[in-house]
Design a protein with these regions (language model features):
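Flexible "arm" and connector segments at domain edges
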Residues: 1-242
Length: 242
């Protein structure tokens, strides 16, 4: 057994465990405070979200855009930690994050992910890869020259702003009619995203979380939308203080 040979890179394990737990609870919040039974379509959708964020990272790497690299790495942590939870449950997800810091994302991580997935013949392979991707996302943030925990918190706080209260929606649309406000918000979300290169969002609708008194907007594929209350993470401000 090798001992006292490798230099340890410090990571706040508890912080990243709490971040993953935040993601798990955040997704439950979108579904009335309960975790659903995961079906095949949900796994396909969540894997798609991971792929989308890995693509953002690869594009940022080509441009050496540090803001977008950090944003994408944090987003990959968010979507992959939930995918790991879907495969393994909460206890195992948090246990994976006890691993020491390893390597970082390659500059072609999106291409690498696609190539690897094309060889898979068993769902277990994607499950294991998802755990690796989650840790790579964490380690990419930790090994950057920037304040990794501030960046992660900024992204988590930004995600929380996707869940408006009734009061916030009424204020945005200057009305006392919540049904009208919801209708206008759904239309606005579709309009804002009509020209996305990846394709427009369709079938946008809202659900109400009775327990936590917030609204959540989804498209017809189950992706959580960014309503008018969404606050984009200001990563540029954080790295400017480096």
């Amino acid at each position: 057994m090798i001992e006292k040979f490798f230099k340890e890179i410090k990571v706040d394990v508890d912080f990243y465990k709490k971040a993953a737990k935040h993601v798990i609870d955040w997704n439950a919040k979108a579904r009335g405070g309960e975790q659903p039974e995961f079906d095949q379509a949900m796994f396909v959708s969540q894997i798609g979200f991971v792929r989308e964020e890995l693509k953002e990272y690869e594009e940022a790497a080509k441009a050496n855009d540090h803001v977008e690299l950090l944003d994408a790495a944090a987003d990959v942590f968010v979507v992959s930690s939930y995918l790991v939870y879907m495969f393994f449950g909460e206890e195992a997800t948090l246990k994976f994050l006890e691993n020491q810091v390893g390597t970082v994302f390659t500059e072609t991580i999106y291409t690498d992910f696609d190539n690897m997935e094309a060889t898979f013949t068993d769902p277990v392979q994607m499950a294991v890869l998802s755990a690796g991707i989650m840790n790579l996302a964490r380690d990419t943030l930790v090994r950057s020259v920037y304040a990794d925990k501030k960046i992660m918190k900024e992204v988590l706080d930004s995600n929380d702003s996707k869940y408006p209260t009734k009061k916030q929606l009424l204020a945005v649309w200057n009305t006392s009619d919540i049904d009208l406000a919801i209708s206008q918000e759904c239309a606005a979300i579709e309009e804002r995203n009509a020209n996305r290169p990846e394709g427009a969002y369709t079938g946008v609708h809202a659900t109400y979380n009775e327990k936590q008194k917030v609204y959540v907007f989804f498209d017809d594929k189950g992706k959580i939308m960014k309503p008018s209350t969404f606050v984009k993470p200001d990563i540029a401000k954080i790295i400017a203080k480096k």
